[in-house]
Amino acid sequence: ENKLNAGIKNGIIWHTQGSGKTALAYYNVRYLTDYYQKRGTIAKFYFIVDRLDLLTQAADEFRARGLHVDEIDSKEDFIRNIHSTGTVNNTGKPTITVVNIQKFSKESIVKQSDYAVNIQRIYFLDEAHRSYKPTGSFLANLLSSDREAVIIALTGTPLIGTIYDDEGKPIAGKKYDSKSVFGNYIHKYYYNRSIADGYTLKLIREGIETTYKKKLKKALEEIEMLKGSLDKKELYAHPKYVSALVRYITDDFRKSRIAMNDQSIGGMIVCDSSAQARAIFEELKSYPCSAALILHDVDDKETRKGNIDAFKKGTIDFLVVYNMLLTGFDAPRLKKLYLGRIIKDHNLLQALTRVNRPYKNYRYGYVVDFADIRAEFDKTNKAYF
């Protein structure tokens, strides 16, 4: 309220991963509806995501909390929505429009005549560290859609520092700070506070046992002797290496369930490549555990959703992934993350915090480190904790 009264219409809310940013948006809808009503203004709320699975997840959560949700199916629908002057629905509930940022186009711009009615549009940008790049056309379209809009960027990991390419290599001369795009921080809620308040768990990094390190190293050496020079991705997807890796993972997972006296915990295996993910999934079939392979080109969307829901309900032991589900995925029973590749900066923090959701009486989430992320983990801690 103080920011709005001071004429500030944009900024970042940095709340740690897992602390409930969708819930925060919900409470803001309630509060800001009343705030603008007192000023004779109609508030129109938009929750903006960059992935279809997050759209469905957010819409479901808003409905569960009692909001009326408008879901946008096309750019044409969105053009009609943003040009409309009201938020009327037959339920009497407050309304929020959940929309993919790709629906913003050059045509979805509020015309001067639309300002004749007292309307205040409020945009909540979910996961604002990710796809809202200052050079991207989607963000440019969003920012120009309504010059008077209030823009609240929600993130658990604002982008700070070096930008990396898709292979994880730093791009020379490229730096990024979310504040340069969305404005200063409106509010911050750090990891230590979130842990102290019981909203998230501490993370423990577990190294690999020395005997298994030797076995994995030996497997790599034997592959190189048999096959000659292979690139890293081929080595790590080779059956001999995958066999040793899966043996370790399944043994560790079994021991963890015994040590925690809890058969309900789940695991996620973050693979070095999609080829390795496929190989690990096949190898897991030899063990008395259940697993689902989650890759963008494996199965259709409904099948993947069914597998993800089954994991959340506890009927699948492992999710095997490469890039998918490392952000925006929430499953409290996920307590063991098997990390098979180096991930950088905010992307690393996003991945690690898949295991920080409160569950039963757990105090920790566990990261089993096959990739030796110690240096990256320390660097990320300094930037975000």
Cite the ranges covered by each PLM segment.
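Walker A/P-loop
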Residues: 7-28, 266
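Conserved Walker A/P-loop ATP-binding site and its immediately adjacent core
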Residues: 24, 41-64, 271-277
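Conserved helix-turn-beta segment of the N-terminal RecA-like "Helicase ATP-binding" lobe
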Residues: 53-77, 283, 288
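Inter-Walker segment of RecA-like/P-loop motor cores
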Residues: 63-110
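Conserved C-terminal RecA-like helicase domain
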Residues: 92, 233-321
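SF2 helicase catalytic motif II
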Residues: 114-152
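Conserved RecA-like P-loop NTPase helicase motor core
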Residues: 122, 129, 290-385
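Interdomain helical connector at the RecA1-RecA2 junction of SF1/SF2 helicase-like NTPases
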Residues: 164-264
